[in-house]
């Protein structure tokens, strides 16, 4: 795909671009009141029945990732994370058709890449972390080119509610800052990296500027660093300069308890209970959940950012973990207290059953795994369960 012609770029720089349809000007208004939805991280592009099922619970949006879909080249939509040369036409066609199905079901979509040029998602990279984009700004230019191209293609689609520039960035990883470090350590680290290729804030500004050359209206969703940790906005000196930005964090803390490895422990960490976190161990209960989740809300308040621009883009726990239902209830109680947007992880995932709450607390049927091996649609039927109840009852409100 060719990049912007010089004449078009000149129009962009002079502000002479004509906006798209009338709906474009109102896109940010969708986010003025709390919106609740789910994450779609499936290996096959979801069909209309999938989106209708999510909508039938009362969801209003879906955070859509496409990186598990079969790509035309090495990496879906970006062609090759090692060298961006345009969006493959076949990949774009499939994405647009999927957006049409979601729109028909009444769901807004947040476009969510797991990979960018210079940052291949670890699960598509032999489970190895790829942090090239945080080491060399040459990758920033390729990422900006990709997003400029994608925004040009999607800016007029009625189903798109935001562009989530990259899922769970981690410029801090293997780069001198411990996960869940204290606020001063975070701020000192950022001061030492400001202006470098590790500067997440500057990266976002660069990519947003490229998007705005072709699309002045679609909101941007920006994940915090350290895999979108709720405490990782703490080092940001301010919000981003664009006025149509949503600030997103993910909630799986304490990760040692909510994640898959805990299920393999002889005695899994319980909730409520003491769990490793950061450099030590902490007692996690509804009070600790609330205080942890207060951090992005307080950060936004301190920076003059409205609470309706803060999003819990993901949250969840292993459905077979005994503490999961109580954990979900406590997380959601806190999110709703602050009237935040949220999307649970995940809805009817066809490649991993760990946080698919409609499956209940039992092992999934063997035909689920057979379908994965065969590359065929997931045949397992879903229904509301007690494990899904904390989410379902709120979607229905």
Language model segments and positions:
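Bacterial N-terminal signal peptides
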Residues: 7-16
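Sec/Tat signal peptide C-region and signal peptidase I cleavage site
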Residues: 18-24
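Boundary/entry segment of secreted carbohydrate-active catalytic domains
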Residues: 25-49
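Short, acidic/polar
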Residues: 42-55, 143-146, 289, 293-296
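Aromatic-lined substrate-binding rim segments of carbohydrate-active enzymes
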Residues: 48-121, 142, 200-215, 221, ...
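Surface-exposed, active-site-proximal loop segments in enzymatic domains
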Residues: 70-90, 117-138, 173-189, 354-362
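Active-site region of glycoside hydrolase catalytic domains
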Residues: 123, 131-282, 294-318, 337-343
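Aromatic-rich peripheral "rim/lid" segments of glycoside hydrolase catalytic domains that contact
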Residues: 322-397
């Amino acid at each position: 795909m060719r990049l912007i012609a010089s004449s078009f770029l000149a129009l962009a720089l002079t502000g002479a671009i004509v906006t798209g349809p009338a709906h474009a000007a109102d896109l940010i208004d969708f986010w003025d009141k709390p919106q609740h939805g789910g994450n779609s991280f499936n290996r096959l592009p979801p069909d209309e029945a999938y989106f209708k099922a999510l909508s039938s619970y009362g969801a209003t949006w879906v955070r859509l990732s496409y990186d598990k879909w079969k790509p035309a080249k090495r990496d879906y939509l970006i062609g090759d994370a090692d060298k961006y040369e345009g969006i493959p036409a076949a990949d774009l066609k499939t994405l647009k058709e999927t957006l049409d199905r979601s729109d028909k079901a009444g769901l807004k979509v947040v476009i969510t890449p797991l990979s960018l040029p210079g940052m291949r998602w670890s699960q598509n990279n032999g489970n190895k972390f790829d942090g090239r984009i945080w080491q060399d700004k040459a990758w920033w230019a390729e990422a900006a080119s990709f997003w400029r191209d994608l925004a040009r293609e999607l800016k007029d689609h009625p189903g798109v509610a935001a562009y989530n520039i990259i899922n769970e960035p981690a410029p801090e990883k293997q780069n001198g800052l411990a996960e869940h470090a204290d606020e001063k350590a975070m701020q000192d680290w950022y001061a030492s990296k400001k202006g470098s290729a590790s500067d997440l804030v500057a990266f976002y500004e660069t990519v947003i500027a490229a998007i705005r050359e072709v699309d002045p209206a679609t909101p941007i969703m920006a994940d915090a660093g350290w895999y979108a940790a709720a405490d990782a906005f703490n080092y940001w000196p301010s919000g981003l300069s664009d006025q149509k930005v949503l600030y997103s964090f993910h909630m799986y803390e304490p990760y040692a308890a909510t994640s898959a490895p805990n299920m393999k422990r002889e005695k899994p960490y319980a909730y409520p209970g003491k769990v490793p976190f950061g450099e030590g161990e902490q007692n996690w209960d509804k009070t600790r959940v609330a205080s942890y989740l207060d951090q992005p809300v307080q950060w936004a308040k301190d920076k003059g950012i409205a609470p309706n621009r803060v999003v819990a883009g993901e949250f969840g726990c292993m459905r077979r973990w005994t503490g999961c239902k109580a954990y979900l209830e406590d997380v959601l109680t806190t999110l709703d207290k602050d009237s935040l947007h949220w999307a649970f992880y995940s809805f009817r995932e066809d490649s991993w059953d760990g946080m698919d709450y409609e499956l209940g607390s039992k092992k999934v049927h063997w035909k689920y795994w057979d379908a994965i091996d065969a590359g065929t649609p997931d045949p397992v039927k879903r229904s509301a369960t007690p494990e899904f109840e904390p989410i379902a009852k709120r979607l229905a409100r």
